[in-house]
Structures are given as C-alpha cells and as structure tokens.
C-alpha cells in the first residue's frame, strides 16, 4: 500500500514549500505570511525511488481562533491519517511554545515521526538545531526546502524503514530516476496474460451523496452497502468481489470527499486518504458526478489525482433522470468546457436509483482496462513513432534535428511508451503532446492515459573538439587574411 507522509508544524516553517518541491507543483499557496494553507492539501510524489501521498497541513501555534481553530483540527487529523509524520520546525526562529505543544501531542500518538529543522541555509546549522533535540522525538534532520538541500536524503531516511516493513522494492537508475524496464516479447505476453486473469479492481469515487453506494447496490442487486440520504454514511472503503458474464471484479466503494466546511472530523477523518489510496489500488476509476450539482472543484481534484496516478477512467453523470432538457444541455456544455482535455475517457449519463444506463458502464470499464493492459510490440511502437515523425518532424535544437530512434513498452496500467533518441530531453512539451495523441489515435487507446518517457541516447561526439585538417586550416587562414584586407 502506498505510504502517506504528513507535513505538520506551526505556521510559516516551510511546509507548503516542501510540499511543492515533493509534488513538483504549486498547489499549495506559498508566501512569507503565516496561515496561508487553510486546509489539508494532498499530492502524489515520487522521490528517492518511492511513491507516496504527501499531505500539507495548516499550521498550529496554540492561539487559534475561528478558521485557525479548524486549521489546527485538520493538522491533528492529518497526523492520524499518516504512516510517517515530518514535524517541521524553523531553525532560524528557534524553538517555540507551539513546537513544544506539537511535540507533546506527537509523543502521545505513537506515530513514526521525524523532526525536520528547515531553513538552515546561511546559518550555523548545528548550533541552531541543537535545541530541537530537547523535543524528545529523536534525531533532528537539517533541511533547506526552498533550495532543495537535504530533501531527498530526508525522504530516503524516512520511508526506507516503512518500505522494508511493507516489502516495497524500489528501482533507481544511476541518476536516481525510476527505472522503466524494456520488456521482451515473451515477458510482455506473460505480463498481459497475468493482468487479464486478475479481477478488475474498480474504485467508485466522488463527493458524498452523489450516489456511489446506490450505484454499487444497483450493480450487485442487493442492499450490500448501507445507504442513507446523508453525506458521509460510508465511512471507509469497502472491497466487494463480484462477477459478471465471466469477468471477475472487485468493487471499491469509497468514503466521499466533502467540502471542509461540512466535515465532521470524528466521523470522516479518514475519508480523503482512503479515497486516494483506493485510486492507487484500482485498475479502473469510476468517477461519479451529481448532474444536479454540476462539476465541483472537488470533482476536478479527484480527477487530477486519478490522472496523475495513471489510472484508467470512466465518468458517470448520475441523477440524470428527472431534470429538464435545459439543465441537461447546460450540464453537457459544462462537461465540454471543463473536461474537454480528457477526451479519451467515456462519459455516461445514468440513474443509479432507477438503473438507467448502468448496464452500459461495464463495456467502457472493460474497454478501459483492456486498453491499459494491452500488449503492443516494440516493432509496432517503433513504427508508430516513425509515422509520427514522418507526419510532423521534430523541431531543430541548436541547429540540429531531434532524432527519435526506437520505442518500446515500459509498463502497463498505465501504458508507458519509452522513446530513445538524441536530444529527446529538449523536445518541447507541444511536440510531446502531439506524439502522445498520435500514439493514442494509432493504437486506438480508449479510457486510459498514455505516458511517454524519453531516454537520451549516448552521443559519441560529446566532449570532442573539432580538429581541422591541413587543407581546412590553409583555407581558413586565406579567408581570414581576405577579411582583414577588406577591413583596412
């Protein structure tokens, strides 16, 4: 299971800066002003050979009022959700009463905790960090999150014991990047056969009360999951095995993600992490959206996490019955406007309560899974790559044309295509998007994103200085003397 790392600490110690560096985004607000992170932020990270979910929290300083009190509650809830806690402090400001209070709470929770002294750049770090040993949480790790110093080593140190205990194996190349293996034809065929024989793990996700449990009950034909007309009645992810027409499934019913103003943390403090872990554990994700409420920011957040995880996707617009045509037209227009960038995913309009359109979901779910796990040979991938070059040549880089040599499968679910060539790291994003769409159209991939990885081929001329022949040197001297004569 993918580990969860929570960043906890008082305001303005650098939690959001570290979050952005780990997730390589700017999802959390970052400015030198306390209290900007109003809520937990969730991101997917890969560093030091480990994949993990990172949770950025609002700060705690012991003087909270109003919204700050809620921020403190969110931070405490994040501690409960986490497998590993990074307790962040400010080495420049020194230890405060809030640090002591947080440390006392962490000791009482018996969580795997690492004390991180941030902002050690430009100061005598050893002297500044000495007082944090008195927090009683073990060794103090020095870091400068804004510059990235110490971040990789910290994650490596924090997650290695967890990975060893859970049997997680990491693979890194010499540059510390995740390894994409090159499958032989026999290995690719064996991997596809293995995946085809496994049950399809289907995570049904969405906000509370959009009809996820009703949809599962409709699929199963019985009241297997308790349903009340109250958001959040499903408090934990439930795994339900089933079969249909000879195909095995495992349905994952998740607790919904609700707006924080409506969260009862006692009831649903695990819901977000359970949902995100279910996405990581699934083969296909069915995102359920309420037609009456339209597309909310929470829907887009779940959609973004699903795409970042590389999971196959089907979208169900629920509660489609009983709304007039004008509302239906407005919803379809909003879907085109806000979800047009995921044109590979099938969208279904259903009524989980009455069963309308539910039967058609299976076809799209199986189609998405088959696309995500389909074997494509190296020769076919290389041929498609060459066709894309013939139709639209790669751009020039420093006066030289980018050369793509060959492509092979680097993984399944999601399908990964690894492309080898010269100067491929310098390809603009626009050309990479063109190639990704070209592969999707050529291979008829539906319901799953395709990931392209580019590997640089060794350049045998790199580092060599060009040495002129005797004749070239003579002609160069004549040309230079001619230029000097003209300038006199």
Curated annotation (Swiss-Prot):
InterPro entries: G_ENGA, GTP-bd, GTPase_Der, KH_dom-like, KH_dom-like_a/b, P-loop_NTPase, Small_GTP-bd. SUPFAM superfamilies: P-loop containing nucleoside triphosphate hydrolases. Keywords: GTP-binding, Nucleotide-binding, Repeat, Ribosome biogenesis. Residues 3-166, 200-373 form the EngA-type G domain. Transmembrane segments: none annotated. Residues 374-458 form the KH-like domain. Associates with the 50S ribosomal subunit. GTPase that plays an essential role in the late steps of ribosome biogenesis. Belongs to the TRAFAC class TrmE-Era-EngA-EngB-Septin-like GTPase superfamily. EngA (Der) GTPase family. This is GTPase Der. It comes from Shewanella frigidimarina (strain NCIMB 400).
